[in-house]
Regions:
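N-terminal Rossmann NAD(P)H-binding glycine-rich loop of SDR-like oxidoreductase domains
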Residues: 3-23
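SDR active-site strand-loop-helix element
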Residues: 6, 30, 60-64, 103-109, ...
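Conserved Rossmann-fold NAD(P)-dependent oxidoreductase catalytic core, especially the SDR/UDP-sugar
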Residues: 90-132
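Catalytic helix-loop patch of NAD(P)-dependent Rossmann-fold dehydrogenases
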Residues: 82, 86, 117-159
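C-terminal substrate-binding subdomain of Rossmann-fold SDR/epimerase-dehydratase oxidoreductases
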Residues: 191-287
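NAD(P)H-binding glycine-rich loop region in Rossmannoid oxidoreductase-like domains
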Residues: 36, 44-83
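NAD(P)-cofactor binding segment of oxidoreductase domains
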Residues: 60, 74-103
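Glycine/proline-rich active-site loop of Rossmann-fold NAD(P)-dependent oxidoreductases
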Residues: 142, 154-157, 169-179, 186, ...
Length: 287
């Protein structure tokens, strides 16, 4: 199976390239920046390049994008639209033109935007939560999701969307805290899209992909107002590690990302969870 991975020099894209190669896929990595996981320098805004590099492919995993950090670098709205929306459309059209069967689009949990705010309790974030974009990044991702839906319905392209959780470089304490409720290890993200390559979707699907959480809906009020008490209920052994490192538990947790649908549909089982990382740190290891 021949797979094109865009954004192959990025954090998720590079790990995805290596993960797929480990499973015997023929992978072509494409990015505007050179790296060991990038085979061809290509720009998603270039229609002819996208037509060329999708030729002969069985699937495209599209991770290339401008992200939230690019807003801090003063990229314009036009830049976001050109790269994220027009670039995605170029790839979708190229897939149809070249008979590519599958298109896997990495979106973001940031797209829930204003729906993530509740003064009374943590928000349960599954795919039924309303999308309420807060900025140009969210807006472009929402538009791309709808383009994927359009191509699934009208062109017969097996386009699916993966709203991935947070996987930014972070200090150990912050990374560990985020794994409790909103984080994602890019290795788990790569595994989710690998599983999707072998799944035949009968309808258009959007799937949240995160490290998962042991928290339940009945914990939501307490998580908002006394998160440490809830954490101790599930992970009493964490107290020793946090105290030894002078780390602080979050006092309030504002959301819980649910990947239950991804588990149910694809059999997704994240490995690099809070519990896994807790054990690694407790044994003196870090990844």
């Amino acid at each position: 199976m021949k797979i094109l991975v865009t954004g192959s020099s990025g954090k998720l894209g590079s790990v995805t390239v290596n993960r797929l190669k480990d499973f015997g896929y023929q992978v072509l990595g494409a990015d505007i920046m050179a790296s060991i996981t990038t085979d061809v320098i290509a720009d998603v805004t270039n229609k002819l390049q996208m037509l060329d590099i999708t030729r002969g492919m069985d699937a495209v995993i599209h991770t290339a994008a401008l992200h939230g950090r690019h807003m801090d670098l003063n990229y314009s709205r036009e830049d976001f639209i050109q790269t994220n929306i027009n670039g995605t459309l170029n790839l979708l059209n190229a897939c149809v033109a070249n008979g590519v069967k599958k298109f896997l689009f990495t979106s973001t949990t940031s797209i829930y935007g204003k729906s993530l705010v509740d003064d009374n309790q943590a928000v349960w974030v599954d795919e039924n939560l309303a999308v309420q974009p807060r900025d140009i990044y969210d807006i472009t991702k929402q538009t791309c999701e709808e383009l994927c839906r359009e191509f699934f319905v009208k062109e017969g392209l097996q386009a699916t969307v993966y709203r991935v959780g947070r996987f930014l470089p972070e200090p150990d304490q912050l990374m560990l805290n985020h794994r409790l409720y909103r984080g994602l290890d890019e290795r788990d993200g790569a595994e989710a899209v690998r599983l999707a390559l072998d799944y035949n979707f009968a309808q258009f699907e959007i799937l949240n992909v995160s490290s998962g959480s042991v928290f339940q809906k009945e914990d939501l009020i307490a998580l908002k107002h006394d998160a440490q008490r809830v954490i101790m209920k599930y992970y009493p052994a964490a107290a020793e590690l946090y105290q030894a490192n002078n780390w602080k538990f979050p006092q309030s947790i504002d959301r819980v990302y649910s990947s239950d649908k991804c588990r149910r549909v694809l059999g997704y089982q994240p490995k690099y969870t809070f519990e896994y990382m807790l054990n690694q740190f407790s044994q003196g290891n870090s990844e």
